[in-house]
Amino acid sequence: MLRFLRRTFGRRSMQRYARGAAGRGAAGLGDERDGGPRGGPAAAASSSVLPAAPGGSVFPAGGGPLLTGGAAVHISASGAAKATLYCRVFLLDGTEVSVDLPKHAKGQDLFDQIVYHLDLVETDYFGLQFLDSAQVTHWLDHAKPIKKQMKVGPAYALHFRVKYYSSEPNNLREEFTRYLFVLQLRHDILSGKLKCPYETAVELAALCLQAELGECELPEHTPELVSEFRFIPNQTEAMEFDIFQRWKEYRGKSPAQAELSYLNKAKWLEMYGVDMHVVRGRDGCEYSLGLTPTGILIFEGANKIGLFFWPKITKMDFKKSKLTLVVVEDDDQGREQEHTFVFRLDSARTCKHLWKCAVEHHAFFRLRTPSNSKSARSDFIRLGSRFRFSGRTEYQATHGSRLRRTSTFERKPSKRYPSRRHSTFKASNPVIAAQLCSKANPEVHNYQPQYHPDVHPSQPRWRPHSPNVSNHSICKQNKPCFQDDRPHWKTSASGDGSHFDYVQDQNQRNLGGAYSVTYRDKLMTAL
């Protein structure tokens, strides 16, 4: 034993190790016992271009937010990690970030990697969400190992989302945080999760256009441009015209001002920030519990039948698949009375998930500081769940965070679709539409227009006024492909409605009557 200690900690051994460490440092290498690269010169070369973040994790070069929508970003594990855990995280802008972590990494380790990658400061409002084998969504617990929480994987797929919707968006200090909130709300509205009235939807869509495109310039921008964006499900042409008219009223707003106006408008929606959970009552009927910053909403179908404010809830407990709420209410004489409500869920796992979400919402929005008091009872005889809220509250997030002097980020453009005129033109002209999609707009996502089964996709329509139509003559070199000289596209000079009659007649002939097409210089008639 003494021989081992002298060999390891003796003066000569320490001097020899110091000389070796100095040589490795000059060569840009490191000892794996110190967290240096493993695998020889190749590993050292690959890690030399990746600056290490605090904690020994390796991040992409640059360190700041790499908002490359739709791209894939890889974050390597630290050099000392032998076994790695592979996780895929999808950000709000569409970026997929793959992270390698140690085998026994906790949720906090993965969350720290993501917020460091994004250069996000106000992290308390966000979380990582995943689906279990029963397709039930769960929030990743930062205090527990990832492998113990996620049973589907590897690779483990998670989504970076807003977990706590701020009750007052003006308290969000950073512009980047407000931008992420806008992305989350746009996704909620487009997916149908967040319902909003018609007028509110028009205003929110107009603010999105102002933030992304800037001023509405009438010669350049038309109502047809609005149809290239998607704001709500089942978007109509009449709504797009109203959005365009409202867009013109927001002249002068910067992107940051437009996004703040968006949040201040969206916060008044009835279902803003509501986390819905399906339960069953004592009568066996299905209800929905909505967790909000002010309390718990009760829905029967689409009708709101009750609201339990957080200060009125004195007890919230669960046992197996049964959730119990004790609420204090004033009777007609002003005396307080306790009412007990019992709800049942499909399984004990979903019941505990609802209870945890309710505890987290109550602690985040109602408390100034989380209660860290430990029970006097021994852990050996302790009953119930060990879960305790360990994050920061909204009060701490708004009063304790320090504002940065400067921060820069990139706003990603929205997904664009062909305009309505383009889609209508494509339905009647398959060849020209294919040329438009491949040449004029290579990155525009295609519609699925109404298709006529009796017309070959590569065969252009033959028109009476143009007997020799070919693939080459449809799109000439001296003018864009979208220009068309057919008579029914031109406005009638008389203005007596003959133009409309001609269009109806041509459409009827094309759909029901006989027409001719040319294919490889051969005239074919299809009945």
UniProtKB/Swiss-Prot annotation:
It comes from the Eukaryota. Gene3D superfamilies: 1.20.80.10, Phosphatidylinositol 3-kinase Catalytic Subunit, Chain A, domain 1 (3.10.20.90), Pleckstrin-homology domain (PH domain)/Phosphotyrosine-binding domain (PTB) (2.30.29.30). It is found in: Cytoplasm; Cell junction, Tight junction. Changing T424A: Abolishes in vitro phosphorylation. Residues 23-47, 400-425, 453-482 are annotated as: Disordered. GO terms for biological process: actomyosin structure organization. Residues 85-369 form the FERM domain. The keyword Phosphoprotein applies. Residues 467-476 have a biased composition (Polar residues). Keywords: Cell junction, Cytoplasm, Phosphoprotein, Tight junction. GO terms for molecular function: cytoskeletal protein binding. Expressed in mouse liver cells, with lower amounts in lung, kidney and in 7- to 17-day embryos. Expression not detected in adult mouse heart, brain, spleen, skeletal muscle or testis. May be negatively regulated by phosphorylation. The keyword Phosphoprotein applies. Residues 413-424 have a biased composition (Basic residues). GO terms for cellular component: apical part of cell; bicellular tight junction; cytoplasm; cytoskeleton. InterPro entries: Band_41_domain, EHM2_FERM_F1, Ez/rad/moesin-like, FA, FERM/acyl-CoA-bd_prot_sf, FERM_2, FERM_central, FERM_CS. Interacts (via FERM domain) with ARHGEF18 (via C-terminus); the interaction activates ARHGEF18. Up-regulates the activity of the Rho guanine nucleotide exchange factor ARHGEF18. Involved in the regulation of the circumferential actomyosin belt in epithelial cells. Promotes cellular adhesion, migration and motility in vitro and may play a role in wound healing. May have a role in mediating cytoskeletal changes associated with steroid-induced cell differentiation. This is Band 4.1-like protein 4B. It comes from Mus musculus. The lineage of its organism: Eukaryota, Metazoa, Chordata, Craniata, Vertebrata.
